[in-house]
Structures are given as structure tokens and as C-alpha cells.
């Protein structure tokens, strides 16, 4: 039986090493809105909104070791994509705030531009603007 979507997006959980740095990045720099803070058995979940998607930052009771960082360093989910408007302006702002780019603003095909950056733990975020 195929999955039946209850909403038009998926949510993502990211375990972080320093919740203050991560919230400063995702809320303060990217402007995501925090909608919930929930204590769980293994840490505190901080729910942030991007459109209809939830980005769930988990502040674990015990911080696990960091795995390999980079697009081609290990199998599994390697980056998160945000489809946005205003890529050039965002890139200018991120550069001004010292955010590390793994791929600067680049046209990957006519009408589609991307940029990739690292969050405070080295997780890679892709920003895409189409049209």
C-alpha cells in the first residue's frame, strides 16, 4: 500500500551538539519560527517552521559523536533542501554573518540556482531558487 500523505511536506529531525548555537542559526540567521519546545525521554525537542515543514532540533541528554561531514563522506541523508525566493539576497546576508558555504550561489540549469552552507554542526543545507 502506498503512503497516504496527511500534509504536503515532510518533517526533519536534527540532533545538535549546542542548542544555543543551532537556535541562533536556524531562528536568528535563517528566520525560522520556533513553535514548540518539548521535553522527551532522550532530550529536548525544539520545533521550528518552514512553510508546512517542521525542522525539529533535538538537544540530546547525551551528545553522540559526530559522523563524517560532507556530501560524499557517508551514506544516508546528506543535505536538506529549502526551496526559497531571494537566493542572492540570502547568500549576501549569510556571507556577511560568516556562514560557511560548501557551494556558492551557482546556476545548475537554466532558471535554477542553488547554494549550500553548513549549520553549526556541519550539516549541509541547500537553498534552491527556481524561475
Model-inferred region functions:
Residues 22-27, 94, 122:
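Conserved active-site tyrosine of GNAT-family acetyltransferases
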Residues 16-19:
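Conserved beta-strand-loop-alpha-helix junction that forms the acyl-donor binding cleft
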Residues 12-14:
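Conserved hydrophobic beta-strand within the GNAT/NAT acetyltransferase core sheet
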Residues 124-127:
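Short glycine-/small-residue motifs
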Residues 21, 87-90:
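Short, conserved charged micro-motifs
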Residues 1-10, 33-81, 92-118, 130-131:
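Vicinal oxygen chelate
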Amino acid at each position: 500500500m502506498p503512503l497516504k500523505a496527511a500534509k504536503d511536506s515532510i518533517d526533519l529531525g536534527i540532533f545538535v551538539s549546542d542548542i544555543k548555537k543551532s537556535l541562533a542559526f536556524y531562528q536568528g540567521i535563517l528566520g525560522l519560527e520556533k513553535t514548540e519546545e518539548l521535553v522527551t525521554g532522550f532530550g529536548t525537542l525544539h520545533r521550528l517552521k518552514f512553510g508546512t515543514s517542521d525542522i525539529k532540533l533535538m538537544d540530546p541528554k547525551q551528545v553522540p559523536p559526530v559522523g563524517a561531514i560532507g556530501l560524499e563522506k557517508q551514506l544516508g541523508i546528506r543535505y536538506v533542501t529549502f526551496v526559497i525566493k531571494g537566493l542572492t539576497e540570502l547568500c549576501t546576508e549569510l556571507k556577511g554573518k560568516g556562514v560557511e558555504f560548501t557551494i556558492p550561489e551557482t546556476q545548475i540549469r537554466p532558471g535554477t540556482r542553488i547554494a549550500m552552507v553548513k549549520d553549526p554542526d556541519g550539516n549541509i543545507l541547500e537553498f534552491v531558487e527556481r524561475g
